[in-house]
């Protein structure tokens, strides 16, 4: 397995893996709106500050990390918006290998840390905890569900 930096040019392969994982349990995200999916992938992979990695087993994309570089007063960070391993490859060490490779690569780039969000009720939560990630206790996720179009 090897780590490769991806770009917007890899959008079709990214979409296949991303939807193959996140439209199933436990996420069940509805990505049937192809325009919205394209825009989301472009948001994450098509910006000058985007940082996207793929984990390949031969020619097969089996892992994906989409995020961006954030310059912060404590140092430059890698913010991961989406991280996944192909469903049939989960539980076999690919995720641990992938995350370790990303950590080593960003360290070589001079980035100080990785920041990501996940839900507590999905298997990824325990995976991150076992991989030495800790909860930031003073942060809270807030969501405004008001209809801003009618304001």
Where are the language model's segments positioned?
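A short beta-loop-alpha structural element at the N-terminal edge
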Residues: 1-16
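Conserved GNAT-fold acetyl-CoA-binding loop/helix
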Residues: 19-41
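A short helix-loop-beta-strand connector motif used in the catalytic cores of GNAT acetyltransferases and
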Residues: 42-54
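Conserved beta-strand in the GNAT
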Residues: 52-54, 60-69, 79, 84
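A conserved beta-turn-beta hairpin within the catalytic core of GNAT-like acetyltransferases
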Residues: 70-80, 90, 136-137
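Conserved acetyl-CoA-binding loop-helix of GNAT-fold acetyltransferases
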Residues: 85, 91-104, 130
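Conserved beta-strand-loop-alpha-helix junction that forms the acyl-donor binding cleft
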Residues: 90, 115-125, 142-146
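Conserved GNAT acetyl-CoA-binding A-motif
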Residues: 99, 106-119
């Amino acid at each position: 397995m090897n780590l490769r930096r991806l770009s917007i040019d890899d959008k079709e392969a990214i979409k296949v893996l991303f939807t193959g994982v996140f439209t199933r349990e436990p996420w069940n995200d509805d990505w049937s709106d192809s325009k919205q999916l394209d825009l989301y992938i472009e948001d994450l992979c098509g910006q000058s500050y985007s940082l996207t990695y793929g984990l390949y087993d031969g020619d097969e994309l089996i892992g994906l990390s989409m995020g961006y570089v954030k310059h912060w007063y404590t140092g430059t960070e890698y913010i991961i918006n989406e991280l996944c391993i192909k469903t049939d490859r989960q539980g076999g060490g690919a995720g641990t290998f992938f995350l370790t490779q990303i950590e080593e690569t960003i360290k070589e780039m001079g980035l100080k840390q990785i920041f990501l969000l996940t839900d507590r009720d999905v298997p990824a939560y325990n995976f991150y905890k076992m991989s030495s990630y800790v909860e930031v206790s003073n942060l809270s996720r807030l969501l405004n569900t008001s209809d801003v179009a009618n304001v």
